[in-house]
Amino acid sequence: LDTDSTRITSSFNYFPDSELQNLIRQVNQTRAYYKKQGFDEVYLSIIPNKTSIVAPKMGRYNHLVERVQQNSMLKTPFIDSWTPFVQHSQEVYSLSDTHWNCKGQAMWLEAVNHYLSEPKFSILNHSEQNL
């Protein structure tokens, strides 16, 4: 399904800039909504499908993940799984299907933990802000 360009989930499905802008607006609106509901922050983490990492040259690749993450309209902080997945492309997905394997899951979790362990997320800083 990742390679069938007629399906919206395909890495080769045409995704025009107008749809990209709409998608980013919706992501930003979702973040604003949940922040208004009391969440400290909302993050975006796009898990790239196997074809976009392992075989992007099988067709006319739409670069959707990169286009979202690099778009200046995106106000929602994102946790980048694209970069480490590309660097370890043959190691992060199951051989027999399109799902990520334990290494892929661990790499994503490591990226999340690294992002959340930055100084702005420390308990001390959070406590001081609430005084």
Task: Mark where each language-model region is.
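Extracellular glycan-modifying ectodomains
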Residues: L1-L131
